[in-house]
Protein backbone atom coordinates (compact mmCIF):
# COMPACT_ATOMS: atom_id res chain seq x y z
CA UNK A 1 0.00 0.00 0.00
CA UNK A 2 1.31 3.43 -0.92
CA UNK A 3 0.69 6.19 1.62
CA UNK A 4 1.02 9.90 0.94
CA UNK A 5 1.50 12.47 3.66
CA UNK A 6 2.50 16.11 3.60
CA UNK A 7 5.59 17.39 5.38
CA UNK A 8 5.91 20.43 7.59
CA UNK A 9 8.56 22.11 5.45
CA UNK A 10 7.75 25.54 4.01
CA UNK A 11 11.05 25.95 2.15
CA UNK A 12 10.45 26.55 -1.55
CA UNK A 13 6.70 27.09 -1.13
CA UNK A 14 4.78 30.29 -1.79
CA UNK A 15 1.83 31.28 0.34
CA UNK A 16 -0.98 33.76 0.06
CA UNK A 17 -2.67 35.18 3.13
CA UNK A 18 -5.99 36.98 2.82
CA UNK A 19 -6.90 38.84 6.01
CA UNK A 20 -9.85 41.05 6.89
CA UNK A 21 -9.36 44.47 8.45
CA UNK A 22 -12.51 44.19 10.57
CA UNK A 23 -11.57 43.22 14.16
CA UNK A 24 -8.03 44.17 13.11
CA UNK A 25 -6.46 43.89 16.57
CA UNK A 26 -7.23 40.16 16.67
CA UNK A 27 -6.76 39.58 12.94
CA UNK A 28 -3.27 41.10 13.13
CA UNK A 29 -2.33 38.57 15.83
CA UNK A 30 -3.55 35.75 13.58
CA UNK A 31 -1.58 37.11 10.62
CA UNK A 32 1.54 37.36 12.78
CA UNK A 33 1.00 33.76 13.90
CA UNK A 34 0.63 32.54 10.32
CA UNK A 35 3.76 34.35 9.13
CA UNK A 36 5.73 33.16 12.16
CA UNK A 37 4.69 29.56 11.46
CA UNK A 38 5.78 29.76 7.82
CA UNK A 39 9.14 31.31 8.72
CA UNK A 40 9.82 28.80 11.52
CA UNK A 41 9.20 25.97 9.06
CA UNK A 42 11.78 27.22 6.56
CA UNK A 43 9.71 29.64 4.49
CA UNK A 44 10.86 33.09 3.45
CA UNK A 45 9.08 36.40 3.92
CA UNK A 46 9.46 37.19 0.21
CA UNK A 47 7.45 34.03 -0.57
CA UNK A 48 4.41 35.33 1.33
CA UNK A 49 1.81 37.58 -0.29
CA UNK A 50 -0.52 39.37 2.13
CA UNK A 51 -3.83 40.75 0.86
CA UNK A 52 -6.07 42.87 3.13
CA UNK A 53 -9.82 43.04 2.57
CA UNK A 54 -12.49 45.08 4.39
CA UNK A 55 -14.24 42.21 6.20
CA UNK A 56 -14.74 38.47 6.27
CA UNK A 57 -17.44 38.62 3.57
CA UNK A 58 -14.77 39.73 1.07
CA UNK A 59 -12.30 36.97 1.99
CA UNK A 60 -13.52 34.27 -0.45
CA UNK A 61 -13.43 36.46 -3.56
CA UNK A 62 -9.90 37.68 -2.77
CA UNK A 63 -8.78 34.14 -1.91
CA UNK A 64 -10.10 33.01 -5.29
CA UNK A 65 -8.09 35.63 -7.16
CA UNK A 66 -4.92 34.85 -5.22
CA UNK A 67 -5.33 31.08 -5.48
CA UNK A 68 -5.64 31.34 -9.26
CA UNK A 69 -2.05 32.57 -9.43
CA UNK A 70 0.16 29.73 -10.62
CA UNK A 71 3.02 30.67 -8.28
CA UNK A 72 0.90 30.38 -5.11
CA UNK A 73 1.01 26.91 -3.51
CA UNK A 74 -1.58 27.51 -0.76
CA UNK A 75 -3.76 30.30 0.59
CA UNK A 76 -4.56 31.01 4.24
CA UNK A 77 -7.83 32.81 4.97
CA UNK A 78 -7.80 34.89 8.17
CA UNK A 79 -10.60 36.80 9.85
CA UNK A 80 -12.53 37.16 13.09
CA UNK A 81 -16.31 36.93 13.34
CA UNK A 82 -17.98 37.56 16.69
CA UNK A 83 -21.66 36.77 17.18
CA UNK A 84 -23.92 39.76 17.73
CA UNK A 85 -27.62 40.15 18.49
CA UNK A 86 -28.78 39.58 14.89
CA UNK A 87 -28.49 36.60 12.49
CA UNK A 88 -25.84 38.49 10.46
CA UNK A 89 -23.04 36.43 12.08
CA UNK A 90 -24.63 33.13 10.99
CA UNK A 91 -25.02 34.25 7.38
CA UNK A 92 -21.48 35.56 7.08
CA UNK A 93 -19.85 32.59 8.87
CA UNK A 94 -21.75 30.09 6.74
CA UNK A 95 -21.07 31.81 3.41
CA UNK A 96 -17.37 32.38 4.12
CA UNK A 97 -16.89 28.73 5.13
CA UNK A 98 -18.81 27.41 2.14
CA UNK A 99 -17.13 29.82 -0.26
CA UNK A 100 -13.65 28.80 0.83
CA UNK A 101 -14.44 25.08 0.70
CA UNK A 102 -15.91 25.43 -2.79
CA UNK A 103 -12.89 27.41 -4.02
CA UNK A 104 -10.46 24.80 -2.72
CA UNK A 105 -12.34 22.05 -4.53
CA UNK A 106 -12.82 24.05 -7.72
CA UNK A 107 -9.23 25.29 -7.96
CA UNK A 108 -7.66 22.10 -6.60
CA UNK A 109 -5.42 24.14 -4.32
CA UNK A 110 -5.07 24.12 -0.52
CA UNK A 111 -7.06 26.91 1.11
CA UNK A 112 -6.96 26.78 4.88
CA UNK A 113 -9.42 28.26 7.36
CA UNK A 114 -7.98 30.71 9.87
CA UNK A 115 -11.27 32.50 10.42
CA UNK A 116 -12.31 32.58 14.06
CA UNK A 117 -16.06 32.26 14.58
CA UNK A 118 -16.75 33.03 18.23
CA UNK A 119 -19.80 33.68 20.37
CA UNK A 120 -17.97 36.25 22.48
CA UNK A 121 -14.99 38.59 22.31
CA UNK A 122 -13.36 36.54 25.07
CA UNK A 123 -13.56 33.37 22.96
CA UNK A 124 -12.05 35.20 20.00
CA UNK A 125 -9.18 36.53 22.13
CA UNK A 126 -8.48 33.01 23.45
CA UNK A 127 -8.16 31.70 19.87
CA UNK A 128 -5.97 34.56 18.68
CA UNK A 129 -2.92 33.60 20.68
CA UNK A 130 -3.80 33.00 24.32
CA UNK A 131 -5.53 29.98 25.94
CA UNK A 132 -6.46 28.07 22.79
CA UNK A 133 -3.38 28.79 20.68
CA UNK A 134 -3.26 30.92 17.56
CA UNK A 135 -5.63 29.88 14.77
CA UNK A 136 -3.49 31.77 12.25
CA UNK A 137 -0.51 29.58 13.17
CA UNK A 138 -2.68 26.46 12.92
CA UNK A 139 -4.06 27.45 9.52
CA UNK A 140 -0.53 28.11 8.24
CA UNK A 141 0.65 24.73 9.53
CA UNK A 142 -2.19 23.04 7.62
CA UNK A 143 -1.31 25.07 4.51
CA UNK A 144 2.33 23.93 4.68
CA UNK A 145 1.36 20.28 5.07
CA UNK A 146 -1.30 20.37 2.35
CA UNK A 147 0.91 22.23 -0.15
CA UNK A 148 3.56 19.54 0.28
CA UNK A 149 0.96 16.79 -0.01
CA UNK A 150 -0.42 18.25 -3.26
CA UNK A 151 3.11 18.37 -4.71
CA UNK A 152 3.51 14.66 -3.95
CA UNK A 153 0.11 13.74 -5.37
CA UNK A 154 0.72 15.56 -8.65
Curated annotation (Swiss-Prot):
Keyword Transferase: yes
Positions in coiled-coil regions: none
Pfam families attached to this UniProt entry: DMRL_synthase
InterPro entries given in the database record: LS, LS/RS, LS/RS_sf
Residues the record lists as binding (2S)-2-hydroxy-3-oxobutyl phosphate: 85-86, 127
Entry EC no(s): 2.5.1.78
Example of a GO cellular component annotation carried by this entry: cytosol
Gene3D superfamilies (alphabetical): Lumazine/riboflavin synthase
Sequence intervals crossing the membrane: none
Reactions the enzyme catalyzes: (2S)-2-hydroxy-3-oxobutyl phosphate + 5-amino-6-(D-ribitylamino)uracil = 6,7-dimethyl-8-(1-D-ribityl)lumazine + phosphate + 2 H2O + H(+)
Single biological process term from Gene Ontology: riboflavin biosynthetic process
Pathway: Cofactor biosynthesis; riboflavin biosynthesis; riboflavin from 2-hydroxy-3-oxobutyl phosphate and 5-amino-6-(D-ribitylamino)uracil: step 1/2
Task performed by this protein: Catalyzes the formation of 6,7-dimethyl-8-ribityllumazine by condensation of 5-amino-6-(D-ribitylamino)uracil with 3,4-dihydroxy-2-butanone 4-phosphate. This is the penultimate step in the biosynthesis of riboflavin.
Protein family (similarity comment): Belongs to the DMRL synthase family.
Protein name per the record: 6,7-dimethyl-8-ribityllumazine synthase
Name of the encoding gene: ribH
